[in-house]
């Protein structure tokens, strides 16, 4: 049985303090639970993205390791905005996406938002992941799933630009101010 801080499993995401309740080891277990859940629902591929928090690269690697151990293929789209993970999951036909983000929380926090096979995981679905981790109830693949990186930025921008139809020429002024 795995010991894990149950309080990090919130109603609509998983989040905790980096290095305390949320470590790379914990994130790898979460990856195993998510990979197992995707497989149960008929999925074979999960897109992962992350924000710019310092723990993001290590957490992305750990998450991917856990998912791959179940046989799920991982597409890592790197540092992106959360909507880009959801876009990539649909655009690539994966139907599953996981965003590693601390959102509005202080810098020492990080977290995970999840969509598996088109369903945003929340409430009991998140508690089900916790139960799977506690019971060590994971799919174990004969061979690990694949891993690839992909830059989805141009496809995302082209989709947005393609969706906008102007009836007249637009003039825009922008002041970037402090960044």
Give a label for each model feature.
Residues 1-65, 69-71, 149-172:
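An N-terminal, well-structured beta->alpha segment
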Residues 9-10, 15-19, 23, 80, ...:
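Generic, ordered loop/turn and secondary-structure boundary motif
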Residues 34, 92, 133-136:
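Alpha-helix boundary/capping residues
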Residues 36-37, 73-76, 103, 124-130, ...:
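Short, surface-exposed, polar/charged, turn-prone segments marking secondary-structure boundaries
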Residues 41-117:
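Ferredoxin-reductase
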Residues 110-179:
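Gly/Ser/Thr-enriched, mixed-charge loops and adjacent short helices
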């Amino acid at each position: 049985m795995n010991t894990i801080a149950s309080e990090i499993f919130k109603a609509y995401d998983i989040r905790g303090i980096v290095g305390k309740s949320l470590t790379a080891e914990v994130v790898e277990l979460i990856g195993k639970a998510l990979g197992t859940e995707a497989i149960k629902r008929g999925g074979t591929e999960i897109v992962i993205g992350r924000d710019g928090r310092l723990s993001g690269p290590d957490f992305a690697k750990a998450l991917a390791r856990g998912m791959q151990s179940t046989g799920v293929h991982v597409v890592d789209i790197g540092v992106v905005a959360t909507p880009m993970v959801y876009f990539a999951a649909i655009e690539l036909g994966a139907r599953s996406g996981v965003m590693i983000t601390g959102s509005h929380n202080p810098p020492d926090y990080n977290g995970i938002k999840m969509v598996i096979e088109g369903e945003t995981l929340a409430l009991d679905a998140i508690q089900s992941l916790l139960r799977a981790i506690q019971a060590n109830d994971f799919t174990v693949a004969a061979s690990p799933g694949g891993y690839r990186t992909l830059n989805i930025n141009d496809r995302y921008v082209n989709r947005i630009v393609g969706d906008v139809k102007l009836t007249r020429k637009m003039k825009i002024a922008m002041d970037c101010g402090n960044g």
